[in-house]
């Protein structure tokens, strides 16, 4: 690394140290990461859909290298992959950067990022571009590898992605069975499962749709309790809106929908989840018989699908991985 680049990184570290808010410092402590790295990562997340994040992710990678933090280096590589994943129109780049993340994760013994890139980016990319059979083929290949290596982290990602695939294929019962397997594996071996809140939220949606309110409430409570990020919290809240809408408690649904709307306005990191918000908003308006507003929300949802190049997917689905 050149002397000039080291000086530039030093300046970035200094500036971040000055402006890091107390909340970010606290979150950095929770995740056991240097606060300046975490603050810069949050800035990357705010620009995840913009080309500038490509250079920012490179900077994050070198900042992490200066700190000898291989985990944040993997995060930086994953952030670059995230950009191409969300663009949705450059398969070669998704495949290439998936391979880069997997290679680095393999070399540094970080299976979490190895399977994240494979499942939550490459396979989900195939799903969101309407190729569920290719996604299933990749998932089965990944499952075989995780089973052969007896890699519990890999199995978690496999079970989760299987649930996504069968949800897309409208095999809801099979999808819920895979989610249950993911939860059981997590609890049995006390595994770190950063996104398990999303799994509980999805399971709650299944119970809501299949008129099992008691099970839905239990899953929703667990989704809230296990939320680790702003995206987890918003998805849990949206699942609650669906539950209230289905059960006819429209005042509660409207109140929580308003809270969600405010969170989206306040936090740019949630931008890629707006499609999910509009889907829930449309469902609420349909159930409360506000059909003109329901149509408007559906049109906004479709516009988001076009923006994220996810129009090939079922409108109920996504934003629920990776994340990273």
Predicted regions and their residues:
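N-terminal leader/linker segments that initiate helical-solenoid repeat arrays
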Residues: 2, 22-78, 88-92, 111
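Bacterial N-terminal signal peptides
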Residues: 10-18
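Hydrophobic positions within repeat-based interaction scaffolds
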Residues: 28-38, 51, 92, 176, ...
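Residue signature of alpha-solenoid helical repeat architecture, marking inter-repeat boundaries
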Residues: 31, 71, 112-114, 153, ...
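Tandem amphipathic alpha-helical repeat scaffolds
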Residues: 37-49, 75-89, 116-130, 157-170, ...
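Helix-turn-helix repeat elements of alpha-solenoid scaffolds
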Residues: 46-59, 88-100, 130-141, 171-181, ...
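Amphipathic alpha-helical segments of tetratricopeptide repeats
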Residues: 58-65, 99-106, 140-147, 180-191, ...
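Solenoidal tandem-repeat scaffolds enriched in leucines and small polar residues
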Residues: 145-229
């Amino acid at each position: 690394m050149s002397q000039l680049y080291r000086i530039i990184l030093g300046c970035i570290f200094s500036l971040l140290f000055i402006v890091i808010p107390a909340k970010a410092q606290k979150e950095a402590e929770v995740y056991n990461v240097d606060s300046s790295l975490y603050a810069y990562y949050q800035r990357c997340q705010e620009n995840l859909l913009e080309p500038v994040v490509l250079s920012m992710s490179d900077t994050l990678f070198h900042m992490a290298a200066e700190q000898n933090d291989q985990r944040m280096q993997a995060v930086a590589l994953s952030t670059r992959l995230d950009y191409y994943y969300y663009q949705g129109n450059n398969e070669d780049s998704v495949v290439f950067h998936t391979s880069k993340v997997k290679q680095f994760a393999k070399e540094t013994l970080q299976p979490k990022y190895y399977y994240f890139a494979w499942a939550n980016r490459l396979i989900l990319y195939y799903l969101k571009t309407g190729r569920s059979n290719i996604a299933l083929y990749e998932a089965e290949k990944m499952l075989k590898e995780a089973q052969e290596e007896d890699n519990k982290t890999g199995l978690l990602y496999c079970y989760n992605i299987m649930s996504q695939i069968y949800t897309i294929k409208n095999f809801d019962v099979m999808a819920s069975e895979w989610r249950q397997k993911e939860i059981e594996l997590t609890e049995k071996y006390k595994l770190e499962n950063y996104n398990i809140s999303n799994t509980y939220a999805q399971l709650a949606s299944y119970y809501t749709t299949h008129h099992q309110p008691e099970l839905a409430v239990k899953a929703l409570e667990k989704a809230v309790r296990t939320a680790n990020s702003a995206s987890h919290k918003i998805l849990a809240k949206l699942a609650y809106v669906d539950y209230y809408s289905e059960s006819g408690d429209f005042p509660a649904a409207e109140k929580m929908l308003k809270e969600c709307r405010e969170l989206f306005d306040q936090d740019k990191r949630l931008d890629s989840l707006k499609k999910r918000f509009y889907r829930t908003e449309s469902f609420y308006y349909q159930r409360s018989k506000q059909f003109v507003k329901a149509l408007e929300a559906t049109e906004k949802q479709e516009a988001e699908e076009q923006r994220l190049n996810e129009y090939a997917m079922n409108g109920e689905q996504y934003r629920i991985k990776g994340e990273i």
